[in-house]
Amino acid sequence: MRIGIFTDTYRPQVNGVVSSITTLERELRKKGHKVYIITTTDPDAPAVEPNVLRIPSMEFKPLPQYRLGLLYSSRIIKKIKKLNLDIIHSQTEWGVGTFARFAAINLEIPLVHTYHTLYEYYTHYITRGHFTVPAKKLAAAISRFYCEKCDALIVPTRKVEDILYSYDVDKVMNIIPTGLDLDRFYRKNYTEEEIKFMRESFGIEENEFLCVYIGRIAQEKSIDVLIDMFSKIKDKTFKFMIVGRGPITEDLKKQAEDLGIADRVIFAGEVPHDKVPVYYQMGDVFLNASISETQGLTFVEAMAAETPVNARYDLNLEDLLVKNEAGLVYRNEEEFVNNIMLLKKDKEFRNNIVKNAFNVSQDYTAEKFGERVEAVYKKTIEEYDINESFTIFRGEKYIQQIRRWTSIKSSGRSPWSK
């Protein structure tokens, strides 16, 4: 197959969506498919990128790490047409996602969409605390509109499926969790001496119990909740390491100082991608309090690393942790603390959790991810009916309007530049 993946975010950016796309791209190419990436321009992108087509874009001010691409460019459409795509796979509901829909209509190509992000948990970046309820309703409306107008819909977890149904999305959904390169997280890759050396480099003694959080340092991750609950553990042999970077780092440092635990909370900062696995190995337990995750890939990484997970209860953890006794969940401060104490005191219990978690993680391999998405592509192409697809896009009149609009040539690139 000749596959076009449309996304607002791609390398050199680093985030969960980019990781998912990179993994999918590689697995599809292993299977002999031709994969093209259609994404936004980026000032840090390489000058030459085989099979990558970049759409003029500009910085999105509320979230500077993201870029907003043109909704349409006749020049880019002509280039896409020459690719002779069999399927278009959009990874966003916004700029490039809209472009993907226009391309699917104009070029009569089936459209598959993956819904990655629960926007209702991120509206604070735009509203700054104002109009929160209307913003969440708008996010739901946009999600519903886009998801219903594709030929096939992929979601990563049952939680996302349930939320989209609550948005009144009337569409059959394919639940396909993102796959990961798990090999690099396995404990067998690291010696006890290497792990001990890394712990000592941060002042962690052999008898100390290290809790770790790895991820973006942002409001929706609820790291402040973790720090507050961790402060209830008065035993000074317990320490908490926060790995990552983000806009609220300084606020969290102040919180730790105010709680009198600054000497037990370690801010490791951002670490190179290839060094992340050893930080899981350093930890005695992986902590998380976020309920904004669509699937929680860091949970799977910790499970593959044989580091037990203690996470705030959320629906997406039912299949991942609860059902298979592959990790611990808490609903309040008391359960949070009790879980940590249990993992420290009961070695047999901890070993059973770790064993179950490792086995569950094997269902999240990159290879299985590629196979599942490939199957959706094949089914969508087989069942594709151009007339029915046009109906999905709200009828012939709507199609004619889009085609008239998209026949207008792009008037220029500024400020949509690299």
What do these predicted ranges mean?
Residues 1-56, 374, 378, 396-418:
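N-terminal subdomain of nucleotide-sugar transferases
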Residues 19, 209-232, 240, 247-253:
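A conserved mid-protein helix/loop that constitutes part of the nucleotide-sugar donor-binding site
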Residues 39, 53-56, 133, 139-194:
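Donor nucleotide-sugar binding/catalytic pocket of nucleotide-sugar-dependent glycosyltransferases
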Residues 147, 270-271, 278-283:
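Short alpha-helical donor nucleotide-sugar binding micro-motif in glycosyltransferases
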Residues 251-271:
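Nucleotide-activated donor-binding/catalytic signature segment of Leloir-type glycosyltransferases, i.e.
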Residues 291:
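Aromatic "clamp/platform" in nucleotide-sugar-dependent glycosyltransferases that forms part
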Residues 308-311:
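Short hydrophobic beta-strand element within catalytic cores of glycosyltransferases
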Residues 323-334, 342-348:
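Conserved acidic donor-binding segment of nucleotide-sugar-dependent glycosyltransferases
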